């Protein structure tokens, strides 16, 4: 049965009303043809079947009509490990495009092979489905009999619900009352009207984060592509058109292919789903905060990175989305493809954006599949994309950062503060308890109260929500990467620069002790300061460590670990035959050096590297090892080969 892109369109329509005739026919066919052995399973064999989520069980038991659900396969690619293996096999590091291409081919190959038996069965029985490769799963529309049959396939790990949910971030949105058109927005509390800006007034969020000072250095996001996964975008908005990657200013025409994708197909808000549109205004607002320039309308620059380009994907329908629709946009961002194309064969990973903004939430309490979306975000991160996520609008209670994707370690989660730097009451707090991790979230806070930006019909308005804080950060990263291109694709170190340069705020909310500390579950590491981040990135350091034994003989293959005592970031390397180990890129802070392992561990604490300081040198000894270190400013060119020595952060 046809799966691209018709199923997406049929699914969208059926979610809002009755089943289309073609799906009714498919359902009847599925019931009338004989099922394979996988479906002929007796009740006593239940233990041998793949797991099924309680939410999906309830949906299937509620009636005989087909529902949308996810078939998650057992064979899943560890994207990070796959790329490490590819670099090892190549005997050299891969650049960003090569890494993205290698990952795309690995994911699609594995998914095609393992999905083949299921897809053949689904085709034979006329069952509508949509396969994915970014996580190895298939979205299926079927009834209880279809679900039971699929549970019997050896390739299947579990079945999960794919509920149609109203985004928690758009639901919590607050707007000012002076919007000029009659366009109906998502429901939200009305806020006090914001006064209209003049050409001399920048939005406070840009000023507070010191973006203009970065522009003065010549860095405006040039060469960087940011992405919006949201309710859509008015691409030809006066403030956004020039920064749209699909707009050719010389030819005065647009090419939307590879620059826009509408998951909802024929339920697009335009007659042609290949043309960007926005059915709520939320997405247009967030893109404006990333790249908008309203000077042509007699206003000011409204975006953090007016020199960056943007692309978009509509993952929500009237503010409603599903785990599958969210995953589909991530898949487009990993390797963009045409609206009518096949993501498995038509993807172009070389056109993938650098940074992906996500101002939406997917509640597990309503059936959102935590594990699948976690793997999706981890894969995007492994590809070198920064996944920025709004923390949520469920504050001020503790442990309210509880929804995908902001709850994940692989996402960079952002809370909201006002023009005075005070945390917004609605901003969700950590720690993350939904998965039992106790993970510190959010990482940072950014402006998110009465944020002035673009909205549909060439208008402007002020919104409040962590949805507004997240694009401030996504735009800030575009500035950072345009200033320090050696960080492009290195998500770990990019996050380190952002959190280490943030303005710390002492707070005791959601902590076991009443003593205010930083970082904390309210503000994270503090308030976003992109000028300080760029300053830090432009003054990198390097460390060289020499390890000898008690008789001064160089020691080979000895573990050397440098730990940032503020963030817990861990650099791991080992000595060569000359006893030397090098950590090529780090930033000022306080570190702990650890030599060896287990009972033979030599620890040197309190190594302080300060901005503008002279090289830091020291030694340490114990009964087995002698270690001498030197940490100094880097003034040479950052070579891509250094990535071989850059470890990943140890994340809780």
Region spans (language model):
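C-terminal subdomain of the subtilisin-like protease fold in secreted/lumenal serine endopeptidases
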Residues: 55, 203, 344-357, 482-542, ...
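Catalytic-core environment of secreted peptidases
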Residues: 255-269, 277, 338, 419-471, ...
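Hydrolase catalytic cores
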Residues: 287-290, 311-319, 400, 448-518
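Short, acidic Ser/Thr/Gly-rich low-complexity loop/linker segments typical of extracellular
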Residues: 564-585
């Amino acid at each position: 049965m046809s799966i691209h892109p018709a199923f997406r369109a049929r699914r969208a329509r059926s979610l809002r009303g009755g089943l289309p005739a073609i799906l009714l026919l498919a359902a009847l066919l599925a019931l009338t043809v004989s099922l394979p052995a996988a479906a002929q399973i007796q009740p006593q064999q239940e233990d041998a079947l793949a797991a099924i989520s309680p939410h999906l069980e309830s949906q299937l038991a509620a009636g005989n009509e087909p529902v949308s659900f996810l078939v998650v396969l057992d064979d899943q690619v560890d994207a990070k490990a796959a790329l490490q293996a590819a670099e090892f096999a190549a005997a050299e590091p891969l650049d960003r495009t090569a890494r993205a291409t290698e990952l795309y081919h690995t994911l699609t190959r594995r998914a095609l092979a393992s999905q083949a038996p299921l897809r053949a069965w689904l085709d034979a029985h006329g069952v509508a489905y949509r396969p994915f490769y970014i996580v190895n799963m298939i979205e299926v529309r079927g009834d209880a009999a279809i679900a039971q049959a699929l549970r019997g396939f050896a390739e299947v790990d579990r079945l999960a619900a794919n509920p149609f949910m109203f985004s928690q971030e758009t639901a919590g949105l607050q707007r000012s009352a002076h919007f000029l058109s009659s366009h109906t927005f998502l429901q939200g509390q009305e806020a006090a009207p914001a006064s209209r800006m003049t050409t001399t007034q920048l939005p406070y969020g840009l000023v507070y984060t010191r973006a203009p000072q970065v522009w003065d250095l010549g860095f405006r996001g040039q060469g960087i592509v940011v992405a919006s996964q949201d309710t859509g975008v008015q691409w030809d908005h006066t403030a956004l058109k020039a920064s749209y990657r699909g707009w050719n200013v010389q030819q005065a025409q647009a090419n939307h292919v590879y620059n826009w994708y509408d998951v909802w197909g024929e339920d697009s808000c335009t007659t042609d789903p290949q043309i960007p549109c926005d059915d709520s205004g939320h997405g247009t607002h967030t893109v404006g905060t990333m790249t908008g320039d309203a000077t042509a309308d007699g206003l000011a620059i409204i975006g953090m990175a007016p020199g960056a380009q943007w692309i978009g994907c509509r993952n929500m329908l009237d503010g409603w989305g599903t785990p599958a629709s969210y995953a589909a946009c991530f898949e487009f961002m990993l390797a963009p493809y045409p609206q009518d194309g096949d993501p498995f064969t038509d993807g172009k990973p070389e056109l993938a954006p650098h940074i992906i903004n996500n101002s939406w939430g997917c509640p597990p309490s309503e059936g959102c599949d935590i594990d699948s979306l976690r793997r999706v975000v981890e894969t995007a991160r492994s590809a070198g994309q920064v996944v920025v996520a709004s923390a949520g609008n469920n504050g001020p209670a503790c442990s309210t950062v509880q929804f995908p994707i902001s709850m994940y370690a692989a996402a960079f989660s952002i809370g909201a503060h006002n023009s005075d730097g005070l945390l917004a009451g609605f901003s969700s707090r950590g720690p993350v308890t939904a998965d039992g991790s106790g993970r510190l979230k959010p990482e940072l806070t950014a402006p998110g109260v009465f944020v002035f930006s673009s909205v549909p019909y060439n208008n402007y308005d002020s919104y409040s929500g962590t949805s507004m804080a997240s694009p401030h950060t996504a735009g800030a990263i575009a500035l950072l990467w345009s200033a320090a291109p050696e960080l492009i694709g290195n998500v770990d170190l990019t996050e380190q620069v952002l959190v280490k340069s943030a303005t710390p705020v002492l707070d005791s909310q959601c902590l076991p002790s009443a003593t205010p500390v930083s970082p904390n579950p309210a503000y994270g590491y503090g308030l976003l300061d992109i000028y300080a981040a760029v300053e830090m990135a432009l003054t990198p350091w390097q460390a060289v460590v020499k390890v000898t034994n008690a008789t001064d003989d160089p020691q080979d293959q000895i573990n050397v670990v440098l730990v940032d005592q503020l963030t817990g970031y861990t650099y791991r390397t080992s000595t060569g035959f000359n006893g030397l180990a090098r950590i090529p890129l780090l930033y000022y802070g306080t570190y702990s050096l650890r030599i060896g392992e287990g009972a033979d561990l030599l620890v040197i604490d309190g190594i302080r590297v300060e901005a503008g300081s002279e090289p830091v040198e020291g030694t340490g000894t114990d009964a087995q090892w002698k270690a001498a270190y030197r940490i100094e400013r880097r003034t040479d060119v950052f070579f891509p080969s250094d990535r071989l020595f850059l470890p990943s952060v140890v994340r809780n």
